[in-house]
Amino acid sequence: MGIRSTSVSDAVAALDERSREIFRRIVEGYLESGEPLGSRNLSRLLPMSLSPASVRNVMSDLEDLGLIYSPHISAGRLPTQIGLRFFVDAFMQVGDLSAEDRASIDRQVRAESGGNPVESMMNEASRMLSGISRGAGLVITSKSDPVLKHVEFIRLEPTKALAVLVGDHDQVENRIIELPAGVTSSQLAEAANFLNAHMSGQTLPELRKQLSQLKDNVRHELDALSRDLVERGIAVWAGSPDEGKPAQLIIRGRANLLEGLAGAEDLDRLRLLFDDLEKKDSLIEILNLAETGSGVRIFIGSENKLFSLSGSSLIVAPYRDDDDRIVGAVGVIGPTRLNYSRIVPMVDYTAQLVSRLSRNPL
């Protein structure tokens, strides 16, 4: 029975010492060079004495388990995607980052090139992750919530008005609202003045939290029509629970993905990957993948339906805001032969660092 029908632990238990060692050498050789390893070379690398014929017998058993395969006749063996998952779960050792590595990541991520310090930090994080991997570094940032600066209602027709919200960096959001029957221009102005007095300096999520308190104030300060108008304005600006979904993908190191392409088939897979990364739904899906675990998630090839056609691997971890809510993700995407044991702790540390720095910008 192959590994497809058994758990990883069952498969590990079924392998003896020499099978484990041969499998480990095949995977490590693939991760290092991308090239298949043959029985003759393997017999020279092994710590135990085994003839090429004995190595071939073990390789045949590993192939039956679905852990390795031969890319073409008379070639060595490469790990399958199932074999890579098996290796990552059962063999890979992820150590702690050295103080030097942590200092290097801190220095690169904190490197500020002017402008918005948070945006600079995200760009540097993406660039740094690209530099330490053979893939592309990515950062998904959540939609920022503007601090409210000014509110205005502009009548469009008797039953409709344009609700205008101006943020602290002069970003403008316009929403059309239905007007209560009989509302006057003076009541529009009165409602806007009330909101400017009570909402200025807050973000939309903060406004949402204070909705009930504002309603109490409205009852004391405004007439019925103005109260209705204020509540409609608050409701339309507060938006939906999905308002904070990711809005931007920062990706660096796309050129890394061009290295080692073997032909038209590899180029087609890369094109599919780039197409996937341009889709808004893909960003949401990546963030959803990051949210499903407590730390770093590893998706190899077809395990992740998002990039299954391109055969890419994704290593991703979420970062959080002051309220411990997941607001974005950092990671690396690239070929399946990424250096997982080195990249995983770096993605993990980078996510923690971005969480800290986004709460307290540079």
Curated annotation (Swiss-Prot):
SUPFAM superfamilies: GAF domain-like (SSF55781), Winged helix' DNA-binding domain (SSF46785). It comes from the Bacteria. One of its GO terms (biological process) is negative regulation of DNA-templated transcription. Coiled coil: none annotated. InterPro entries: GAF-like_dom_sf, HrcA, HrcA_C, WH-like_DNA-bd_sf, WH_DNA-bd_sf, WHTH_transcript_rep_HrcA_IDD. GO terms for molecular function: DNA binding. Keywords: Repressor, Stress response, Transcription, Transcription regulation. Pfam families: HrcA (PF01628). Belongs to the HrcA family. Negative regulator of class I heat shock genes (grpE-dnaK-dnaJ and groELS operons). Prevents heat-shock induction of these operons. This is Heat-inducible transcription repressor HrcA. The lineage of its organism: Bacteria, Pseudomonadati, Pseudomonadota, Alphaproteobacteria, Hyphomicrobiales.
